[in-house]
Amino acid sequence: MAVVPTPGPKGPRRSLHFVPGGNARMFEKALTLNADTLILDLEDSVTPENKEAARRAVCDWIEQADFGAKECLVRINPQDSPWGRDDAEAIAAARPDGLVLPKVSSRASVDAVDQLISAIEEQNNVQPGAISLVLIGTELPEAVFCLADMAGNGRVDGLTWGAEDLAGELGARAKRNAEGVYLDVFRFVRSSCLLAAVANQV
């Protein structure tokens, strides 16, 4: 099966490079790389006591750095965490190309962030829909059953999957068999994510 790179606002997302939020040295290095997309991370790579400082640093990077042809996405914290809503508000106001939403659970959770961003775009005279959403759609079991619905939000232009958090939710002792092949549940989730993305042309 031929794989077609997912298009973002600045072109195909053939390569994505994660940058820990708040790590200026790694950010400066990332700007010199050939990745199509830089994902500035406020979630897993930032400890709780550094969340707010990292958010401020990432906002400064977005507003001051020259990304050139690189797409700038920011993975914010989950919306049900102590930092999620503040992340969404502050980062959207800084105007990246898009937000990466982890641990989405339903279409309502995606729509809520969409509405928040719409209000910020209006307040700042930004073209409606200019800030996209990329969903990590398989980190919670309940999300797997509404992938297509979540991806149907008009602001969503990317849908991806991950096994790590889902394995934790399931209490799985392993993700792969002895041959290194994903176990059935993870293969099902990965395929479901692909089908939902194609069905919604994201």
Placement of each model-derived feature along the sequence:
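Expand to "…catalyze enediolate/carbanion chemistry for C-C bond making/breaking, isomerization
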Residues: 1-202
